[in-house]
Curated annotation (Swiss-Prot):
Biased composition (Basic and acidic residues): 26-41
Keywords in alphabetical order: Antibiotic resistance, Methyltransferase, RNA-binding, S-adenosyl-L-methionine, Transferase
EC class (word): transferase
GO biological process, one term: response to antibiotic
Catalytic activity reported: adenosine(2085) in 23S rRNA + 2 S-adenosyl-L-methionine = N(6)-dimethyladenosine(2085) in 23S rRNA + 2 S-adenosyl-L-homocysteine + 2 H(+)
Protein name, UniProt field: rRNA adenine N-6-methyltransferase
GO annotations of cellular component type: cytosol
Record family assignment: Belongs to the class I-like SAM-binding methyltransferase superfamily. rRNA adenine N(6)-methyltransferase family.
Length: 319
């Protein structure tokens, strides 16, 4: 994970909420931005014996802790979350509580998760009074938390390095209504088609989840200043899925075949499982050229292709 450079300016407020150095799965990580760079034994301040030999600065970097410098940004994010009035809201990565404070008026109950044990006492002190009786601070790894049985919204200024795991958790949660994350801008743009290209994850989950980019947050809003800007990513679980549950397995198999890259085009990949006539008809219905590369096919075009092809049985292997 890339080390965030130090800001040339002092932070505007001590009340801060977390943002994070660049996100990096093995597939999406830019060269030289790996987590191991932050874990070098030559990192400054590594001689402290606290926290198992980690200095507070090193622990902060390993937990992807960069903090929002202005409360106004947290309030902007909170307005975009829009949880159900009186409903349950979970926050992942409470940090020092700035976003928590901004979210609290918008929900009936708020459970704020924070993995860093050093931040928990201050959080519990800040939200322990009667004004925040509906707020509960939860320590530990959010990814180990059980999914609520009741409908809930999810929000957070999440670690770039843990974005994939947190997003997967949200997508698997059957009672989720929406998730609103501040995360790496590149990731948010990639997942929402903002580059004009669409990812496998977005297309695969589109029948049940809508992905949107709600805005961006400048890197200058964080202290220390990270290398990249952040985006506000919104994932909404559809009240009425675009496909019936019985069709999802076939849809997922078609999408995975299409993203296999065999033949260099979506048509060539799908031709392995479908006859030319029905496939040509599906491409005409979706207004797709046979030479189109899979990344440039929108989720709605995928659905048109699938709905046109679904009555057609796949060819047996080898034919």
């Amino acid at each position: 994970m890339a080390r965030a450079p130090r800001s040339p300016h002092p932070a505007r407020s001590r009340e801060t909420s977390r943002a994070h150095p660049p996100y990096g799965t093995r597939a999406d990580r830019a060269p030289g931005r790996g987590r191991d760079r932050d874990r070098s034994p030559d990192s400054p301040g590594n001689t402290s014996s606290r926290d198992g030999g980690r200095s507070p600065d090193r622990a902060r970097r390993e937990l992807s802790q960069n903090f929002l410098a202005r409360r106004a940004v947290a309030e902007r994010v909170a307005r975009l979350v829009r949880p159900a009035p009186g409903g349950l809201l979970l926050e992942v990565g409470a940090g020092r509580g700035v976003l928590t404070e901004a979210l609290a008026p918008y929900c009936g109950r708020l459970v704020a998760h924070e993995i860093d044990p050093r931040l928990l006492p201050a959080l519990r002190d800040r939200f322990g009074g009667p004004h925040h009786a509906h707020v509960r601070i939860s320590g530990g790894d959010f990814l180990a938390a059980p999914v609520p049985r009741e409908p809930f919204a999810l929000a957070g200024n999440i670690p770039y390095s843990r974005t994939a795991g947190i997003v997967d958790w949200a997508l698997r949660a059957r009672t989720l209504t929406s998730a609103t994350f501040v995360t790496q801008l590149e990731y948010a743009r990639k997942r929402t088609g903002d580059y004009g290209r669409w990812s496998l994850l977005t297309v695969r989950t589109w029948p049940r989840h809508e992905w949107r980019l709600l805005g961006r947050v400048s890197r200058r809003e964080f202290r220390p200043v990270p290398r990249v800007d952040s985006g506000i990513l919104r994932i909404e679980r559809r009240e009425r899925p675009l496909l019936p549950s019985a069709a999802l397995g076939d849809y997922h198999r078609m999408v995975e075949l299409g993203f296999s890259g065999v033949g260099g085009s979506l048509y060539a990949s799908l031709r392995r499982a479908h006859r030319a006539g029905p496939l040509d008809a599906a491409f005409r219905a979706a207004r797709l050229d046979r030479s189109v590369v899979v990344a440039y096919v929108t989720p709605e075009q995928w659905l048109t292709v699938f709905r046109t092809l679904r009555p057609v049985r796949s060819r047996p292997a080898g034919r």
